[in-house]
Design a protein with these regions (language model features):
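Short, compositionally stereotyped local motifs that mark structural "simplifiers"
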Residues: 719-824, 829-834, 840-867, 890-892, ...
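Aromatic-lined ligand-binding clefts that engage carbohydrates, nucleic acids, or primary amines
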Residues: 747-749, 869-871, 875-889, 919
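C-terminal motif of bacterial Sec signal peptides marking the signal peptidase cleavage site
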Residues: 20-21
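Accessory carbohydrate-recognition regions in carbohydrate-active enzymes
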Residues: 25-390, 396-445, 453-479, 485-488, ...
């Protein structure tokens, strides 16, 4: 098989480096960091200056308003708009870009990458056409600029609070002169999150000679630079108020005055300390650059949200003060980072972990729910699951407990009960109907894992009733497993599968993925998943296929990148999959694939991150995998072992101890034959958190050929909730949704020699129920329930499906007076079809058929069409709407197709008589078309 690599040559941009093997470690890890890595392709990182976890990220903005503008900078650009003080790193959504400074009236400013320099805490660019050298550094809350103008260049500086990276709504904002060398300002916006406040106080190394204000939110300053001295500007920022912005500025920079180099050196020292937490020896220069840049990227997010006096803005917009010694954090991409970044931090920085858990709990206290994706002082609601529960449970079960655990469990339980994204159906029915909610399969699978986390937390605290509730819910993944395809599939409310099914398609039932990329997501119960597949052999064959099938996908989704077969390293749902071989007795394949992914998915170039860096998750995968272990199931306290990338690594652990990791010639050997910790052999293919935190020496003995004995015995496999052989849930392969006359049903199980007992009256089957022996015919609407049994196996879950006979309801006896459909046209911003009813009617009329071609705007409009459908004969008809923003189709009073607020289409069937039933179609179009 040839690796299908999305890092094609056409993406490369002109930086070419030749790296050779070298056994010597660099003098300082900071010298191996390249902040330009990830600024090309879709990495969405920024090259500018920031302190570790800094509240200020001072970086150039080269574009806005499109997906590759998420960080404000893209390496393919050659002009910039200026330097703003807040940025996101590696995200898939755009926001921030606050407080833009531009050292020229020219816009945009032309630059060359050959004139850029970047290192942790420092960025510079020589803007030759504008005649100014721009240099940037930061402290945690202050951005520091140094502009060196050519003598013949007028020293002009534009301060722009109107600048936005995305189409945000500006509630208010202003810039004011508050001294001969001082400006203050603020703005409040609604973007990815509502009510984003930012305040600043800017002080300059010399008075400005003039100031003009083109608008209330802009200022143009001029300076006398005949002395030849550069202009240094210090900008203190806060999301609380102007007074705190000033206090941040004073406490973090007053002792340095306007000495740019001294401030830069202090921040560089902070970075040297942060990057010294893991040092590696051996490997190539390229691998060390990848490693230390990954470590750097893992320490710029989350961001400090509290000021130097401890004040911070809460999610209810109130201002509170944290206890001394603590920090409040925001910018958590929990859907991404629960997988590897947070488990990595439990090893490296337990103080940080405690602060983060306290921050999450404070967000719960202010809003009534643990956050999914908090930003600034609000919740974006982006992505799925409730993965704050994983973060908290993982910390608590590892003994990191600097918070009220009972309160944490309460927050976890309440957040899991919120009626969001189909959670009401998930709790009541055990699955989320795909005809009612989008992303139903992905949501269910991630809810199930999060519920397992809550169960473990409850058990540790002695709440066994809660444990039983949530551990039962954690097995709901079984309900959407289709044995006929061996995929998790979208299930309609009546128990029938969504059709047609294409595992290579970007479907409505999955989040940023195909069915392949969610096929193996049961991190808490991999053994249970193998039982659904029919056993180890079937599971291994399908896991092999993941990496071997075509990388073509049906549909367009920019997140699905870094494809090897259908494994997509550029997006997080795939990140654990190479490690699953260690659960089924083939750890040597884990070692093969992790090495290949390390080698081919990360490069020391701007395009070198194969997808969104995602707030440290892509980097954490690289760091942990290159050290030789990875957390597949946070909360289990286990890390799956794999082959290290480096000869030696030193980890400074969060408890003050040091772990030394050694391996013999990993450049030549990628297979494990033996692992010891402080001289004691580890036979399992995993190591525990407690073992790692002992410190000492973790030694890997490697070979050039696979050792198919090490770690292969079933008793050496990592944790799974299911411990005993279990019969897979039965299934019916054909669709029983609507049938005319009669239909045949055939029950099967992936478990060899399983005996299926079933009922046709809706009752629960047991071993006294009839034994299935051959297909049976249904002539009426019937609820089929089935359960699989086998000696020595735990019985399966009950399978339930409704076979529905089509009932042709008479249509209205009416004779339409016109051909076509009536329409009502609306304009505005809509999230749901119901929002149309609140909008102002722009136009009404009649057209031959439903169409949006006459819309007066390219986006932000909606239609409601009404009329009648002509059915040429009685029968069952199929309907679909192909809108990717939101649409709902009613026939009579029945909702037939529900694509509301969705970005994927769904089909439906409905019986019609030959007469004319009424139709109502409502749809809207947003920014994405």
């Amino acid at each position: 098989m040839r690796l299908i690599q999305t890092l094609s040559s056409c993406l490369c941009t002109g930086i070419t480096a030749l790296f050779t093997a070298c056994s010597q470690a660099p003098q300082s890890p900071i010298d191996s960091v390249d902040p330009f890595i990830g600024t090309g392709f879709h990495g969405h990182t920024y090259p500018g200056a920031t302190a570790p976890y800094g509240a200020v990220q001072l970086s150039p903005d080269t574009r806005k308003g499109n997906w590759d503008a998420c960080s404000g900078y893209h390496y393919s650009d050659s002009t910039l708009m200026g330097f703003s003080h807040t940025h996101l790193s590696g995200t898939g959504c755009i926001d921030l870009g606050d407080i833009l400074f531009r050292p020229s009236l020219q816009t945009p400013l032309v630059f060359s990458h050959s004139d850029e320099k970047a290192s942790p805490g420092y960025y510079s660019v020589n803007l030759r056409e504008a005649g100014v050298l721009a240099e940037l550094t930061t402290t945690p809350h202050v951005g520091i600029h140094r502009y060196t103008y050519k003598k013949e260049t007028e020293a002009t500086l534009v301060v722009d609070m109107d600048h936005l990276l995305d189409n945000e709504y500006m509630y208010e904002g202003w810039v004011k002169r508050t001294g001969d060398n001082e400006l203050t300002g603020m703005r409040r916006t609604r973007g990815w999150v509502d009510n984003q406040y930012v305040f600043f106080v800017a002080q300059f190394s010399q008075p400005f000679s003039s100031m003009e204000q083109p608008s209330e939110r802009q200022a143009v300053l001029t300076f006398d630079t005949t002395t030849g001295k550069p202009i240094v500007c210090k900008v203190g920022a806060s999301i609380v108020n102007e007074e705190n912005a000033r206090l941040n500025l004073e406490q973090e920079t007053d002792s340095y005055g306007f000495d740019f180099d001294a401030i830069h050196q202090a921040t560089r020292s902070d970075w040297e300390k942060e990057l010294d937490v893991i040092t590696v020896e051996g490997g190539t220069e390229a691998e060390r650059t990848n490693f230390y840049t990954a470590l750097y990227h893992s320490k710029i997010i989350p961001n400090i949200a509290s000021d130097v006096n401890g004040q911070y803005r809460r999610h209810d917009m109130s201002v509170a003060t944290i206890p001394a010694g603590r920090r409040q954090f925001s910018t958590f991409s929990t859907w991404d980072t629960f997988r590897a970044w947070h488990p990595m931090m439990t090893l490296l920085d337990t103080t940080l972990v405690n602060d983060m858990v306290q921050s999450l709990l404070d967000m719960y206290d202010a809003s009534g729910e643990l956050p999914l994706w908090p930003l600034s002082a609000g919740e974006t609601g982006t992505m799925i699951g409730y993965h704050s529960t994983s973060i908290i449970a993982d910390a608590y079960l590892k003994g990191i407990r600097g918070y009220d655990a009972e309160h944490a469990l309460e927050a976890m339980k309440i957040s899991a009960e919120k009626n969001k994204k189909g959670a009401d159906y998930y709790i009541k029915e055990g699955f989320i109907p795909t005809n009612i909610k989008k992303e139903s399969v992905s949501c269910l699978l991630e809810f199930a894992y999060d519920d397992w986390c809550i169960a473990q937390m409850a058990k540790a605290l002695g709440h066994m009733d809660d444990y039983e509730t949530f551990i039962k819910r954690s097995q709901n993944f079984i309900n959407v497993f289709d044995g006929s395809t061996r995929f998790f599939r979208g299930k309609r409310q009546d128990g029938n599968w969504e059709t047609p099914f294409d595992p290579f398609a970007i479907g409505r039932s999955y989040t940023e993925a195909t069915a392949w990329q969610y096929r193996f997501f049961t991190p808490h119960d991999v053994y249970g998943l193998t039982q659904l597949f029919g056993g180890r052999e079937a599971f291994i064959a399908d896991l092999d296929s993941l990496f071997m099938v075509t990388s073509e996908v049906v549909g367009d989704l920019v997140d699905v990148t870094g494809l090897v077969g259908q494994y997509a390293h550029g997006n997080e749902p795939s990140h654990h999959m190479a490690y699953l071989y260690s659960y089924v007795g083939q750890p040597w394949k884990t070692q093969e694939w992790t090495r290949r992914l390390l080698d081919e998915m990360y490069q020391p170039t701007p395009e070198g991150i194969i997808g969104n860096e995602d707030c440290g998750q892509m980097s954490a995968w690289y760091i942990l995998s290159s050290l030789g272990f990875y957390s597949v199931c946070p909360g289990s306290n286990q890390f799956i072992l794999t082959t290290p990338l480096f000869d030696k690594a030193n980890m400074k652990l969060g408890n003050g101890k040091t772990l030394v990791i050694t391996a013999n010639q990993p450049d030549k050997n990628k297979y494990i034959t033996k692992v010891t910790l402080n001289g004691e052999e580890i036979s399992h293919c995993y190591i525990t958190y407690d073992q790692l935190m002992q410190g000492g020496t973790l030694d890997f003995t490697l070979s050039a050929t696979p050792d198919k004995r090490w770690g292969t015995a079933p008793e050496y496999a990592p944790y799974s909730y299911t411990e005993q052989p279990t019969v897979s849930i039965p299934y019916i392969a054909n669709d029983l949704d609507l049938f005319e006359g009669e239909i045949t049903a055939e029950l099967k199980s992936t478990t060899p020699e399983a005996v299926i007992h079933y009922t046709l009256d809706g009752s629960e089957p047991d071993e006294n129920a009839p034994v299935y022996s051959e297909p049976f015919v249904l002539k009426e609407t019937t609820i089929i329930k089935a359960k699989g049994y086998k000696k020595g196996f735990v019985p399966s879950r009950t399978y339930s499906i409704q076979a529905t006979k089509a009932v042709l309801r008479p249509a209205l006896s009416i004779q339409p007076t016109k051909h076509g459909v009536a329409y009502t046209y609306y304009e505005g911003e809509f999230q749901w079809v119901a929002d149309l009813q609140k909008a102002k009617v722009v136009e009404t009329g009649t057209i031959p058929e439903p169409s949006i071609l006459n819309a007066k705007l390219p986006d932000h409009f909606g239609y409601i069409f009404t009329g009648y459908i002509y059915a040429p004969e009685d029968g069952v008809y199929e309907f679909s709407t192909r809108s990717d923003d939101g649409s709902v189709l009613y026939i009579g009073k029945e909702k037939v197709v529900d694509n509301d607020a969705s970005h994927a289409a769904i089909d439906a069937t409905h019986p019609l008589t030959k007469r004319l039933p009424p139709l109502r179609l409502a749809l809207f179009r947003g920014l994405r078309g």
